[in-house]
């Protein structure tokens, strides 16, 4: 530990103590808030089922930066490199297409055994796992419908895929001792004017009810459902809208997933958290960065990321909100993308934990909005960076931008050799 870092830390403790904040307690709380990293940043959402297949479902990964993972071994190695550079607790979020098998496996036939390597790896790296059925990039999703498909046989295929995915998710939770949050997102929708908007939603409702009919221990598995405003090729109508899934999660008491890029550009999910929490037992957050649309850019330490973190902390939602990331940028080093986005989410959580919320709440309750605004702005200048650097130091991870040197070395020695 450098003298400079120690000096900055001591000064920071004093500055925060002056506004009633115990920085040690803030760091202890930060150590209880895992962030679920998404595996698909590492290979541009290709997966191992059909790595050369096209990405469909109205989503896009743009760019062609060299060195993307081509198999599970490479993906896990890249993840390990990123994990070493991110302080504090982490989880890993898997999609069904990241299964491992020597023979082709139909999606409605996936089993826990196809993910046993991921479980053993998670145990070795002390990670929890989360899961997602993959309802896109498949011949039976090519016409834009899955769980709401008008063809009963195709619809049943996707129902069976989601049911099989829930068994995999429960296996994760049972093996790792921490519940797996399994999120259902489907691309179902229409490109142009839609006459019958009701029937697909009726089919989706019935399909979801069948999907979640098998009961699992909530200590092992948690169901979540995710809405979206539109996707490429589904600009005019999305079956799984916000209103649909808010109603579903409320009536069935599942978790609701809020994705930062799945709403109108003028909407923010930070404002939706407190409203949803009045009706649903849990929230899953997909923290992302939409640029004009659901572009899934790397998460920044920007106003919305900070607002999301602040909502969690201010309302003490630590046990009810699950924090996940969802971005995929193929134009930059993929390991660096993980590190940048995840460290930024954790920085936002730390800054929220260092806020004198009780004092601000009292000012708000008394109607002193002048002081509220003044203190909100002044606390941005408090030395939270020194607290962050101490946190990194205690977790044996680089401070500042020193982590980039490690990524560059890994790129030169490993990534550059991938064809």
Swiss-Prot record:
GO terms for molecular function: L-rhamnose isomerase activity; manganese ion binding. GO terms for cellular component: cytoplasm. GO terms for biological process: L-lyxose metabolic process; rhamnose catabolic process. InterPro entries: L-rhamnose_isomerase (IPR050337), Rhamnose_isomerase (IPR009308), Xyl_isomerase-like_sf (IPR036237). It is found in: Cytoplasm. It holds the Pfam family RhaA. Binds 1 Mn(2+) ion per subunit. The keyword Metal-binding applies. Gene3D superfamilies: Divalent-metal-dependent TIM barrel enzymes (3.20.20.150). Its EC number is 5.3.1.14. It catalyses: L-rhamnopyranose = L-rhamnulose. Its cofactor is Mn(2+). Pathway: Carbohydrate degradation; L-rhamnose degradation; glycerone phosphate from L-rhamnose: step 1/3. Keywords: Cytoplasm, Isomerase, Manganese, Metal-binding, Rhamnose metabolism. Signal peptide: none annotated. Homotetramer. Belongs to the rhamnose isomerase family. This is L-rhamnose isomerase. It comes from Salmonella agona (strain SL483). The gene is rhaA.
């Amino acid at each position: 530990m450098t003298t400079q870092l120690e000096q900055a830390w001591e000064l920071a403790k004093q500055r925060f103590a002056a506004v009633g904040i115990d920085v040690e307690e803030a760091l202890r709380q930060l150590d209880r808030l895992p962030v679920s990293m998404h595996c698909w940043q590492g290979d541009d959402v290709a997966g191992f089922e059909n790595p050369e297949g096209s990405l469909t479902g109205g989503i896009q990964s743009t760019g062609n930066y060299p060195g993307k993972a081509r198999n599970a071994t490479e993906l896990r190695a890249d993840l390990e490199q990123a994990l070493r550079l991110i302080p504090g607790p982490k989880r890993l979020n898997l999609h069904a297409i990241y299964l491992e098998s020597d023979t082709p496996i139909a999606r409605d036939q996936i089993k826990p055994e196809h993910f046993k390597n991921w479980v053993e790896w998670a145990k070795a790296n002390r990670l929890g796992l989360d899961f997602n059925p993959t309802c896109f990039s498949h011949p039976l999703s090519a016409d834009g419908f899955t769980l709401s498909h008008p063809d009963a046989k195709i619809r049943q295929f996707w129902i069976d895929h989601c049911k099989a995915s829930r068994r995999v998710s429960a296996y994760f939770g049972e093996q790792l001792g921490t519940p797996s949050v399994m999120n259902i997102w489907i691309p179902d929708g229409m490109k142009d004017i839609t006459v019958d908007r009701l029937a697909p939603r009726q089919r989706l409702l019935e399909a979801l009810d069948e999907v979640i009919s098998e009961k699992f221990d909530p200590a092992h598995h948690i169901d979540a459902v995710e809405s979206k405003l539109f996707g490429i090729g589904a600009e005019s109508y999305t079956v799984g809208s916000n209103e649909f899934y808010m109603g579903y999660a409320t009536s069935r008491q599942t978790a609701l997933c809020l994705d930062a890029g799945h709403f109108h550009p003028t909407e923010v999910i930070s404002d939706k958290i407190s409203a949803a929490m009045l009706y649903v037992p849990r929230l899953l957050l997909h923290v992302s960065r939409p640029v004009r649309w659901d572009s899934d850019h790397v998460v920044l330490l920007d106003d919305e990321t900070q607002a999301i973190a602040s909502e969690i902390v201010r309302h003490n939602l630590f046990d009810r909100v699950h924090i996940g990331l969802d971005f995929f940028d193929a134009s930059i080093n993929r390991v660096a993308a993980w590190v940048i986005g995840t460290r930024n989410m954790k920085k936002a959580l730390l800054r929220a934990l260092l806020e004198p919320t009780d004092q601000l709440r009292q000012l708000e309750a008394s109607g002193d909005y002048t002081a509220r605004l003044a203190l909100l702005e002044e606390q941005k200048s408090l030395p939270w960076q020194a607290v962050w650097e101490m946190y990194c130091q205690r977790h044996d991870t680089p401070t500042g931008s020193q982590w980039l040197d490690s990524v560059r070395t890994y790129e030169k020695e490993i990534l550059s050799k991938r064809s």
